[in-house]
Amino acid sequence: MDSGKSRSLETTVKRVYRDLLLPKINTSKKMSTLTNSPSSLEGTPGIKKNSGEMQAEASAERVKLTKSIKEKQNNELEKVALKRKADSEEKLVGKKEAKIMELDNQLVTTVPLPHIPLKNIMDVEMKLVYVDEEDVSYEFAQPNMCLGLQATGQTATTMPPASPRDLTTLPQIDKWLQVALKDASSCYRQKKYAVAAGQFRTALELCSKGAALGKPFEAHAEDIASIASFIETKLVTCYLRMRKPDLALNHAHRSIVLNPAYFRNHLRQAAVFRCLERYSEAARSAMIADYMFWLCGGSEHSVSKLIKLYWQAMIEEAITRAEAFSVMYTPFATRIKPENIEKVKEVFMRTHPTYVDCIYTDTQGLHVLPQTADWSCFPPQQYLLTLGFKNKEDGKFLEKVSSRKLPTYTEHKTPFSPLTREDTVRHMETVGKRILPILDFIRSTQLNGNFHACSGVMEKLHYASLLSRLQRVKEQAQVINQAMAELATVPYLQDISQQEAELLQSLMADAMDTLEGKKSDKERVWNTIQKVGRIEDFLYQLEDSFLKTKKLRTARRQKTKMKRLQTVQQN
């Protein structure tokens, strides 16, 4: 696909995106599941809307309807759970106590990562990524229905209704769009992937111009998003079949922006990252896919098992390929004490003697591994992550992660002056090659942590700004698309405060404007935050300098005083 047509496609489909972004944020965690407690699926606080009273009313109805479904399902859950708990409590209590004692008294620091053959990874992709889904109805909101796993491995997910409407029938797709999709699917099954990709791009243009549903003026944004997301995923599979993962990447990101709740969208993104050898990001996408499958009520253990296998393989590959650092996971069952962290570091130093210049133990958030991840048990088995570096400079920035809310990682000695081109190139190299790979690895086993809700995304947006300064437009667009996909997913992974929700909305809006090439008198949110971080760093440096100077001055005074006393005594 040439660059002109690609830009045209991006422009035409953005109208669909803009209608969807704010409602998606406002209805965070809108799915319900029979294995969740009522408190864990409470919706996040509302976000201020710019689209008028009608949208606000629709959002309120959405929340009420979702809440009623959750309450009904969770009442049924409590009855079943009490019976199960009574039956299994006696059997489990002995084992659980023994496990906790073992983890408290003995630090079990070796978690085996057996090698997973490439054939097994490809089998997972064939069953879950390259599924030929002709029907887009699986992405429409459907109440209390979960289709079983079919012979092809296709499964449907359920979501509570996103808007107050009659759900007895699914929306009718526009007939011309339906014809285009059937023709494209036919070419795909005939292995004419290039032709199929062209027809799916045509279908995407039809969809973005309003030809998505039979009654366009009565269409809901969620329904249009479902169809657009489906087409984006088909483009992903076409480009993967053509062995062009670089072309598939942006489509994978957009499918998540349009429908972050569908687990296959995340798994397809993981497959693209794998083909690009970005294994840490592939591992995180697979982890989110497994969580979304469970969150949406997926009950097929065979599907979850395949996703976890894929997730495990990506972590293994990321660890194997890491050269700058080594890693150790330590299981724990109770609150970690400072003396336990010191013991972990001692064990790490004995186990990895060449990676001891800088040792960082992440105490900020929960880490999970695919071998023991069970989302229905909250919290699942937790792990401490310890990273060791050959070069102290590579891991130095991690100290800021644990001590500051929104740290900046670029050493900008003059925070009130603009960056020169040389500084920009140097910072881009630092962020792109040293900081982001480590943060991506940390997040490959961390669904959510005690960091800020947008942690991990902010760094990518800062990186996009550096790319923009160097006029690397294509790379900038990819990074922003990826950041938008992560922002769209955040409300499903953790509860966010009102302040965080407003920040999320501002980041998403600015990211969209940047992609569209819109200029604004105001600075982008992430650049403003970066400036605040630089000023904070500058103040910290001034404070450190002042305290050091004060300490030296005090020491000199004491020394002078001692000399005077000695002189007096001698005289």
Swiss-Prot record:
Keywords: Cytoplasmic vesicle, Developmental protein, Differentiation, Golgi apparatus, Spermatogenesis. Residues 30-58 are annotated as: Disordered. Testis-specific. Expressed in spermatocytes and round and elongated spermatids in the seminiferous tubules. It holds the Pfam family NYD-SP12_N. Disruption phenotype: Male mice are infertile with spermiogenic arrest and impaired differentiation of round spermatids into the mature spermatozoa. One of its GO terms (biological process) is spermatogenesis. Residues 30-42 have a biased composition (Polar residues). Transmembrane segments: none annotated. The keyword Flavoprotein does not apply. GO terms for cellular component: acrosomal vesicle; Golgi apparatus. Coiled coil: none annotated. It is found in: Golgi apparatus; Cytoplasmic vesicle, Secretory vesicle, Acrosome. Essential for spermiogenesis and male fertility. Involved in the formation of acrosome during spermatogenesis. Belongs to the SPATA16 family. PANTHER family: SPERMATOGENESIS-ASSOCIATED PROTEIN 16 (PTHR47228:SF1). This is Spermatogenesis-associated protein 16.
